[in-house]
A protein has these predicted regions:
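Nucleotide-activated sugar donor-binding and catalytic core shared by glycosyltransferases
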Residues: 1-164, 169
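Positively charged, low-complexity/disordered segments
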Residues: 165-167, 171-182
Length: 182
């Protein structure tokens, strides 16, 4: 099974899904394809689509995949690399209004240069043949980088949660002090 994930950005990722359709036509792919399409307005009869998945279901799709075609979100990429999968990553591009900036290109380049993934940012059709013989570098990655990033993201989320809690508390105090009804 080939698992495709485009993430959950509000603007969808049509370019990636259209390229998957082109892959099927050009390379005669008959393997089952399941695509998590998020908010993308897209219909096809060439493969199975699902809008969203929970975390456990998402990881199960990755585990069962022979290949993962992914947007360049760090969570999707790191989960796929950690699972030892062959990954083709397509960064969302600012020039196509897929993202506010081009930060995903940097992540794809770093991971591709390191031998963890294949860069398919500009063309999945051109990236597909690179899968043959590709052995993803992953042992050192899953042992060192992922736990560090997990800790960093968890700490940031905890700090952000405390900040927002404090903003709500202060906002309530200000509203109650300055209310004309008190």
């Amino acid at each position: 099974m080939i698992f495709v994930t485009v993430g959950t950005q509000p603007n969808g990722f049509l370019r990636c899904l259209q390229e998957v359709e082109m892959l099927i036509g050009k390379y005669g792919i008959t393997e089952e394809i399941v695509a998590q399409i998020g908010n993308t307005d897209f219909e096809t009869n060439k493969f199975t689509t699902i809008r969203f998945t929970g975390e456990n279901e998402f990881k199960k799709y990755i585990k069962n995949a022979s290949v993962v075609i992914s947007h360049a979100g760090s969570g999707a990429l790191f989960n796929s690399i950690k699972a030892g999968k062959k990954v083709i990553a397509m960064a969302r591009l600012h020039e196509f209004n897929e993202m506010a900036d081009n930060h995903q290109i940097e992540l794809v380049k770093k991971l591709s240069d390191g031998g963890y993934i294949i860069d398919g940012t500009y063309s999945l059709v051109e990236a597909w043949p690179k899968l043959e013989g590709f052995v993803p570098r992953n042992n050192d990655f899953k042992c060192e980088i992922v736990p560090v990033l997990d800790r960093w993201i968890s700490a940031w989320m905890e700090q952000e949660g405390r900040r927002r809690s404090e903003e709500r508390r202060v906002g309530k105090e200000c509203r109650s002090r300055w209310s004309p009804y008190h």
